[in-house]
Amino acid sequence: AFHNYLRERDIPWQVEDLAGAHAQVKQLEHELEKRLSAPDAPELICSVFAVGSEVVADALVSTGKAGQVMVIGNDLFPESALALRRGIFTNIVYKDPTSLAYRGAKTLGDYLLWGRTPTVPVQKGAVEMVFASNVDRYCELAGI
């Protein structure tokens, strides 16, 4: 959807999707370090999962690029909050996991116990952007 959005609006950004999920962390780490060391290194990195955020922070530090590349990390946890405070990340995308878990459990319970199917097949939750200026408040809310 993101690539289509850019194409439809003629936005001239070059976007690279790097492979690497939980089972491919070393591959992601290698690819990131290679890209960050290249002459045409990325100007912005967006991570879409918590482990990826950790890998991005580590790669930025190991290549000496921390604070030189805009980075949007994903999920608020102690290491991502520290990366934001230290200027390694520019922002963090925050999704309230307690609220999402509650809604998921309720939806599943309603289905299993009462046979009620959800009114919409995909439920969406609020997404908030955390900045260095408000990270302490979000950490307090999240119990970090």
Which residues fall in each region the model found?
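Structural signal for conserved beta-strand scaffold positions within catalytic alpha/beta enzyme cores
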Residues: D17, G73, V93-Y94, F131
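Short beta-strand elements at the ligand-binding edges of bilobed clamshell
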Residues: A1, R86-T98
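Short, surface-exposed amphipathic charged segments that create phosphate/polyanion-binding patches used
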Residues: L32-E33, R86, G109
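A structural micro-motif
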Residues: I11-W13, G67-V69, T90
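Hinge/cleft segment of the Venus flytrap/periplasmic-binding protein
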Residues: Y5, R9, D96-I144
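Class I S-adenosyl-L-methionine
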Residues: H3-D10, A57, R85
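Hydrophobic alpha-helical
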Residues: F2, E16-A81
